[in-house]
């Protein structure tokens, strides 16, 4: 495979990831003001700014803020998780030549959070890592690894029985592996999870995506 074709493949797959990065709910957890600000801004940019140059510009600016927060709180998994999520989002918006570098950086940041506490933010670290491992291409283009993704996402749903993102992304992974019957079970569980009244925009959009995927599976029958 030529470098040009590798970049084209990477670009297509990362484009498909856009809009899918985990943003774990944490109704029962108290975030620091700095981390809460990152979460609020991410939601405003993600769901309130149309896709395109302006959204990318704002997400990149938020990425600089997230890097600073993570540097200030290097032992706080919540800060690292949100830095990883935002860096992942930037990767999904970037050109093919910079996307993989951002994805690798997001992986490394999330690994740090995972090593501190994999259960934090409804298993935000293993969930977000799992997304990276099943959405980024594998060798020789990238570091994707379906087996590792499965292991991380299975761990995430065990750690977060009421984690909407953990269950959504596990179901989405199963759907991409054509394990549709299991995916339906997982998606149905996700929809039964109590709504996050403190994050209505994210909660509504995540459930809409789950319902759309359930409809796609039903159409295949």
Model-identified regions with their sequence ranges:
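N-terminal leader/linker segments that initiate helical-solenoid repeat arrays
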Residues: 24-65
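Short coil/turn linking the two alpha-helices of tandem helical-hairpin repeats
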Residues: 38, 43-52, 89-98, 121, ...
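Short coil turns that delineate tetratricopeptide repeat
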Residues: 74, 118-120, 161
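TPR alpha-solenoid repeat register
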Residues: 79, 123-125, 166, 200
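Terminal, low-structured helical/coil segments at or just beyond the last alpha-helical repeat
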Residues: 186, 192-221
């Amino acid at each position: 495979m030529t470098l040009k074709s590798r970049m084209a493949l990477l670009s297509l797959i990362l484009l498909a990831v856009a809009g899918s990065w985990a943003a774990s709910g944490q109704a029962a957890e108290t975030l620091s003001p700095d981390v809460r600000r990152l979460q609020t801004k991410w939601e405003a940019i993600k769901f309130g700014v149309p896709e395109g140059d302006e959204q990318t510009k704002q997400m990149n600016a938020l990425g600089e803020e997230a890097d600073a927060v993570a540097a200030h709180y290097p032992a706080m998994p919540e800060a690292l998780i949100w830095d990883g999520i935002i860096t992942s989002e930037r990767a999904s918006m970037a050109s093919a030549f910079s996307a993989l570098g951002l994805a690798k950086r997001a992986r490394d940041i999330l690994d740090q959070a995972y090593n501190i506490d994999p259960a934090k933010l409804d298993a935000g670290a293993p969930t977000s890592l799992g997304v990276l491992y099943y959405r980024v291409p594998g060798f020789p283009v990238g570091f994707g690894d379906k087996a590792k993704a499965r292991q991380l996402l299975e761990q995430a749903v065990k750690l977060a029985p009421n984690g909407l993102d953990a269950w959504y992304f596990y179901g989405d992974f199963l759907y991409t592996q054509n394990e549709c019957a299991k995916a339906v079970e997982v998606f149905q569980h996700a929809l039964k999870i109590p709504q996050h009244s403190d994050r209505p925009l994210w909660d509504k959009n995540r459930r809409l995506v789950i319902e759309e995927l359930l409809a796609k599976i039903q159409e295949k029958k």
